[in-house]
Amino acid sequence: MNTVCTHCQAINRIPDDRIEDAAKCGRCGHDLFDGEVINATGETLDKLLKDDLPVVIDFWAPWCGPCRNFAPIFEDVAQERSGKVRFVKVNTEAERELSSRFGIRSIPTIMIFKNGQVVDMLNGAVPKAPFDSWLNESL
């Protein structure tokens, strides 16, 4: 499996049976699967979408109340699914070009990508259980 280091964006090849062995980046030594949510920019998102893991992106804005309420749920699920799914946030205020590129019209909008392609989308904040169920169905 190829995976992108969230710290330096280097592509790392990891045998599938070693994913849970605290894999580290070959370039910078950062943990590859730390369960952290990645704040993506226009510069980093395309690289992250090349990851062999599914990528879940939360398009949000700092002024959006539902976005702020959903953030801890997104972070909890990212921790729980570490090494299985990448979780990414895109600030639509700071990254307007990405909002336009992905056709974001309401926030929060959560999109799932596999092999760089959108496979599902969810508009609006949801509680943790429905979010988990949606991920299970979509992944």
Swiss-Prot record:
Gene Ontology CC terms, in alphabetical order: cytoplasm; cytosol
Keywords: Cytoplasm, Disulfide bond, Electron transport, Metal-binding, NAD, Oxidoreductase, Redox-active center, Transport, Zinc, Zinc-finger
Annotated ranges, domain Thioredoxin: 26-139
Class in the EC hierarchy, top level: oxidoreductase
Presence of the UniProt keyword Ribosomal protein in the record: no
Cystine pairs: C64-C67
Substrates-to-products reaction catalysed: [protein]-dithiol + NAD(+) = [protein]-disulfide + NADH + H(+); [protein]-dithiol + NADP(+) = [protein]-disulfide + NADPH + H(+)
SUPFAM superfamilies: Thioredoxin-like
InterPro entries assigned: Thio2_N, Thioredoxin, Thioredoxin-like_sf, Thioredoxin_CS, Thioredoxin_domain
A GO MF term: protein-disulfide reductase [NAD(P)H] activity
PROSITE patterns attached to this UniProt entry: THIOREDOXIN_1, THIOREDOXIN_2
A Pfam family assignment: Thioredoxin
Localization per Swiss-Prot or TrEMBL: Cytoplasm
Lineage top rank: taxon: Bacteria
E.C. no: 1.8.1.8
Family: Belongs to the thioredoxin family.
Stated role: Efficient electron donor for the essential enzyme ribonucleotide reductase. Is also able to reduce the interchain disulfide bridges of insulin.
Protein name, entry field: Thioredoxin 2
